[in-house]
Amino acid sequence: MLKSVLPLSFIVGSRFFGIFIVLPVLSLYALNLKGANEFLIGLLIGAYAIMQMIFQVPFGTLSDKIGRKKTLTIGLVIFIIGSFICAGASDIYTMIGGRLVQGIGAIGAVATAMISDYTKEEIRSRAMAVMGAFIGLGFALSMVLSPILSQKYGLDILFYISAGLSIFCIILLYLIVPKEPKVVHHDEKVPFSKLIFEKDLLIMNITSMFQKMFTSIAFLAIPIVLVKELGYAQADLWKVYAISTSFGFVAMGFGGFLGDGKGFSKAILLVGVALFILSYSVFAVSSTATFFIVGVVIFFIGFNLHEPIMQSCATKFAKSNQKGAALGVFNSFGYFGSFFGGVIGGHILHAHSFGILAVFCIVVCIFWFGLLCYLKDPRVFKNLYFSLDKRLNLGVLNSTKGIIEHYKTNKNQVIKFDTTLIDELEIERICKS
């Protein structure tokens, strides 16, 4: 497992590092670009996300057809081009254009689908935890390095670093990552609309949207409020992010262990939302930088509790032959949330105040918490594995209640089922009849 998961996790972590490294300081430095204002800064933060939203599904679907490696390469090359455009930008509109190009390279769903291709569902949580650890490490490094490097070398160095890492990832993809496994599925692909409107997938998609929306709002507002309104030194922003990501990194470990490892994914999702509510409540009433920073720490804990389990949860509700497309939809919702968060956050901050923005976030989070209560607990799903040489009458399972899907890989015959509707002994009896 590690031979494929480690390099892919590095690629995903590097991509997130490239995305996150500009976020802590982008709103501050971009205000100095020609033609910039708070609304356009919000649009700048959201520009990357809107293109990711549009292209996640096409890239996920393309990867189901031509393969994950080729699709990853296309996305990384596009991201590199966008990074160079941003690095050379001298006005807000060129910077927005570069972020739009960066966003076209929508490989998040492809990389996650590729990791799930290499792993059994029962140990997928470990693979996702490894990926989550790389994302968390990339996140933590970017939060600390971003203010330091931008203060010393300027904003453009961050985009050059992003481009360089992406070039290295392409080399790694072809030198280290093993050949992709093939999957033969018994089902026809479900209509695309079902990937959007199936109840549990829809709840996970909306969860992805809200989580990314509140993250965009936080990264837009935190540096502006701390520096412009509460008098915190811009040069010391890295300390805020270092403290917050340290707590967040510990929370990520707990999230992965208790969520997928112990079967408490749904509970962890709910706890994360509760912490979002608490953090924005602290933001709303803060009159000092110290109290505001407490809210930042709480926010990072909630955010990092979610990170190791969200995509793993989404894959459990998707069939194996459409994981790329399903994760594309999931990530598209997330990136729409990032875009909308940047735009609505910039608008409210420009037209009203941060207090109004925080109250808006609290109200939406309460709705989100209630929605998650209706999510089916992912731990009710299990898989049975049989060797390819074992003779089984799998066709009879097509109309059996409780059978989610069955398919063949190059190693096993796999049957996924709902433990609340059917058990292993009954499945084996039916297959041997």
Model-inferred region functions:
Residues 54-90:
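Conserved MFS/SLC helix-loop-helix module at the cytosolic interface between two early adjacent transmembrane helices
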Residues 65-75, 260-273:
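Cytoplasmic membrane-interface "Motif A"-like loop-to-helix N-cap segments
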Residues 56-67, 251-264, 349:
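Helix-to-loop junctions at the C-terminal end of transmembrane segments
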Residues 178-207:
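Juxtamembrane intracellular "pre-TM" segments in multi-pass secondary transporters
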Residues 164-182, 368-376:
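C-terminal membrane-cytosol helix-exit motif in multi-pass small-molecule transporters
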Residues 49-57, 139-140, 245-253, 338-339:
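Residue-level signature of mid-helix packing/kink "hotspots" within the transmembrane helices
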Residues 24-38, 220-236:
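Short amphipathic helix-loop junctions that connect adjacent transmembrane helices
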Residues 98-135:
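Cytoplasmic helix-loop-helix junction between adjacent transmembrane helices
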